[in-house]
Amino acid sequence: MKVRAAAVAIWVAVGLVGTAVSAHAADGDAKRGKVLAYTCHGCHGVPDYKNAFPNYSVPKLGGQNAQYLINALNGYAGGDRPHQTMHATASTLSEQDRADITAFLQAEVVQPSKQVVGTPPPTTQTCVSCHGSDGAKTIGPEYPILAGQHPDYIVHALEDYKSGKRKNPIMAGIVAGVDAKDFEAIAEFFGQQHGLCSTDELRKHDKCVRDSE
């Protein structure tokens, strides 16, 4: 895979100032958010639940960076992320609702593993600067944790960035020269790392539990 130097330069430069342009919300109340998050649990807490069309796994939200989730909800509400169900749901939530729900979902933010699982494919070199070597240590809270996410969801997200369905100029530049085979390799690697969990696990333990716990 060839990634254009200009795209990488833009990615790094904008990434370093990403925090300044993120849409921050009020401090969240995780206790209230746990109640409000029942609306999320119906899809994101069901094992093996998939979006109908196109077909892909509904993403894991447990342990995800709260600021990233707030930005995602804002994107769904505003139409920058096209998804009818999520648009309808996000549009009903106030700024405080979003802050509370995401505070609960973040719980204890996923921490990097002491040892990376497997050998990272060369294509992940374009991901680690922002998402970390195992996808669990992001350079800022507005970037998503990838570790433990469903591989097919990661592929779907990358495809949407490439097609422009998800409006993000940074990611659009990064994935422009990446093919489907590379998408799958990236997704499989990050998906097998310790990381995110379903809202069902989060409700039971108030955090994403490691296999050894």
Regions found by a protein language model. Give the residues of each.
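N-terminal secretory signal peptides that target proteins for export/translocation
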Residues: 1-4
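Sec/Tat signal peptide C-region and signal peptidase I cleavage site
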Residues: 19-25
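Bacterial N-terminal signal peptides
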Residues: 9-18
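C-terminal capping alpha-helices of c-type cytochrome domains
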Residues: 91-113, 176-213
